[in-house]
């Protein structure tokens, strides 16, 4: 609702906002990963063509030199990120006699995520798009034991983006829009 001050001036109001979400609804199979990557790629393209951006709080970015780099500044934040990426329960488990995961560069983590061991993202996609697909796949994997929970790809998107998603619903299995209420304050 609308909140007024004692003089009748608007202090805050609610605004309808749309978000684009995805659920993993594909059946298991040999080409499931390729299909999911293609759905995510097509969704990203629609979102960006309409001037919106995907949600990205991932700790890897592509630097000006075209190489991946960490976006976190503290060593502890980097180690927590690596722990989560490699599925370890403790930071201490990153380093064993067999491997030293705590020393991995952002480029090595990127190659792990897009490689066959994890999300198998085709090199046909540009590097920046491969990273975006990996980010969304990683966020989807956080709900892998509760497949019915959707993952938000983009928030507060334009009506044009919502319309384009609906127009392409047949090729975007599992992708939908949700409505959120955004509180706007002065």
Protein language model regions, located:
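Membrane-proximal periplasmic segments of bacterial cell-envelope enzymes
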Residues: 1-186
């Amino acid at each position: 609702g609308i909140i007024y001050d004692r003089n009748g001036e608007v202090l805050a109001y609610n605004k309808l906002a749309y978000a684009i979400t995805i659920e993993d609804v594909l059946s298991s199979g040999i080409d499931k990963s390729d299909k999911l990557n293609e759905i995510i790629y097509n969704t990203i393209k629609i979102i960006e063509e309409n001037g919106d951006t995907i949600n990205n709080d991932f700790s890897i970015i592509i630097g000006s030199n075209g190489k991946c780099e960490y976006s976190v500044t503290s060593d502890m934040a980097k180690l927590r990120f690596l722990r989560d990426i490699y599925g370890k329960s403790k930071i201490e488990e990153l380093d064993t006699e067999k491997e030293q995961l705590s020393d991995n560069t952002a480029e090595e983590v990127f190659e792990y995520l897009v490689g066959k061991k994890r999300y198998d993202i085709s090199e046909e996609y540009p590097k920046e798009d491969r990273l975006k697909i990996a980010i969304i796949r990683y966020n989807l994997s956080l709900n892998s034991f509760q497949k019915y929970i959707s993952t938000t790809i983009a928030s507060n998107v334009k009506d044009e983006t919502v319309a384009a998603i609906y127009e392409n619903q047949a090729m975007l299995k599992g992708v939908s829009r949700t409505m959120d209420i955004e509180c706007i304050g002065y």
